[in-house]
């Protein structure tokens, strides 16, 4: 039991680190010491005296960096919540949705352990202009953007998108697509119509860029 709990805590620590990296990579301020949190320090900070994870204590707010606010003025604040309950029903999701509304967060990220009921999932798109995203803990144990085969993706703002289309005399419909369900699109929180610049390494050209629109 203790060994299984240790493995579970280790996975949760890695998920927590990936979430912090994901939030930082979206342009929110995350201090370096938060990214460098060791497993032992994680246990001290987020586990009780019995060594059990206290997920509610892991929830946090993040604000855009100055650079991000200049590029994306409507970005707003973000709230990440780790759910204590193994299975998420309507009541828990409704509480989360109300929290996002009342505190006027622009984005709410809900991290769950096992599953969310279909009825609870129906609440997810219910509070525009705020966006709610859900992630399974297991999907974030490893940061996919750190994989050697995953190129760097950079989200463009509306001005950069318009300039791109003008430069290449393109319509939106002519751009290659990236699906919203793509793991990197989910990681960056891409919305329909947003464009990403993808930088790949080339043996002949050093680096080259391509562009995809989220659909």
From Swiss-Prot:
Cellular compartments annotated: Nucleus
GO biological process, one term: termination of RNA polymerase III transcription
UniProt-recorded Gene Ontology molecular function terms: DNA binding; DNA-directed RNA polymerase activity; RNA-directed RNA polymerase activity
Source organism, top-level taxon: Eukaryota
Record has Cell wall biogenesis/degradation as a keyword: no
Keyword vocabulary terms for this entry: DNA-directed RNA polymerase, Nucleus, Transcription
Gene3D superfamilies documented for this protein: RNA polymerase, Rpb5, N-terminal domain, RPB5-like RNA polymerase subunit
Gene Ontology, cellular component aspect: RNA polymerase I complex; RNA polymerase II, core complex; RNA polymerase III complex
InterPro entries with a match to the protein in the record: Arch_Rpo5/euc_Rpb5, RNA_pol_Rpb5_N, RNA_pol_Rpb5_N_sf, RNA_pol_subH/Rpb5_C, RNA_pol_subH/Rpb5_CS, RPB5-like_sf
Chief location: nucleus
TM regions (residue ranges): none
HAMAP family associated with the record: RNApol_Rpo5_RPB5 (MF_00025)
PANTHER family from the UniProt entry: DNA-DIRECTED RNA POLYMERASES I, II, AND III SUBUNIT RPABC1
Family, as annotated: Belongs to the archaeal Rpo5/eukaryotic RPB5 RNA polymerase subunit family.
The name this protein goes by in its record: DNA-directed RNA polymerases I, II, and III subunit RPABC1
Organism of provenance: Candida glabrata (strain ATCC 2001 / BCRC 20586 / JCM 3761 / NBRC 0622 / NRRL Y-65 / CBS 138) (Yeast)
Name of the gene this protein is made from: RPB5
